[in-house]
């Protein structure tokens, strides 16, 4: 019976708080009741309604927690009594990497250097690409001198100029002005 009475009182406090908030909002927004006395009543109803509503919410929450507290305590005590909490441990010496001095020992290395075991050094590479150099050709072919490249590139242009003069030279200065101005 006490459980039912507490539930009814909790619901009544929630409803009363909500109604007081609604009445305060109605008195403030309604233009018919714009007297000084109605505004005072409205501004008293609003905070009082919020206080009653919040106290009803907290009261209901406290009642529920208090009713179920004994059940939760019983289950928790029963669970803790039957077993100890498992503790996870870590084997520390295996967890950490080896010391610096141990890592320097060649005998203890798990993966020794492969090329050193075979007895020959890694292959030589060229500067331009990563292909293997041929052992019988230790020096790559030297590039031609700069003057030779210029002479080879200039020869076809001179032959073309000798066969036919350019358009600018044929037309003279008039063509140059039209090309510059775009007219």
From Swiss-Prot:
The gene is Tmem252. It is found in: Membrane. The lineage of its organism: Eukaryota, Metazoa, Chordata, Craniata, Vertebrata. Keywords: Membrane, Transmembrane, Transmembrane helix. Pfam families: TMEM252. It is a multi-pass membrane protein. One of its GO terms (cellular component) is membrane. The keyword Transmembrane helix applies. InterPro entries: TMEM252. This is Transmembrane protein 252. The chain crosses the membrane at residues 8-28, 39-59. The keyword ATP-binding does not apply.
């Amino acid at each position: 019976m006490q459980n039912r009475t507490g539930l009814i009182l909790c619901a009544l406090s929630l409803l009363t708080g909500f109604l007081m908030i609604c009445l305060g909002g109605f008195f403030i927004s309604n233009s018919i009741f714009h007297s000084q006395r109605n505004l005072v009543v409205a501004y008293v109803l609003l905070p009082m309604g919020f206080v009653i509503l919040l106290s009803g919410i907290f009261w209901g929450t406290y009642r529920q927690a208090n009713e179920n507290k004994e059940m939760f305590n019983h289950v928790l005590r029963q669970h803790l009594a039957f077993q100890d909490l498992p503790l996870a441990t870590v084997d520390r010496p295996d967890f950490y990497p080896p010391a610096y001095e141990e890592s320097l020992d060649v005998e203890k290395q798990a993966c020794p250097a492969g090329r050193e075991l075979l007895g020959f050094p890694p292959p030589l590479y060229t500067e331009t690409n990563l292909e293997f150099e041929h052992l019988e050709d230790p020096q790559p072919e030297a590039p031609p001198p700069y003057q030779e490249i210029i002479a080879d590139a200039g020869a076809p242009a001179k032959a073309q100029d000798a066969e036919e003069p350019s358009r600018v030279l044929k037309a003279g200065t008039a063509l140059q002005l039209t090309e510059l101005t775009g007219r």
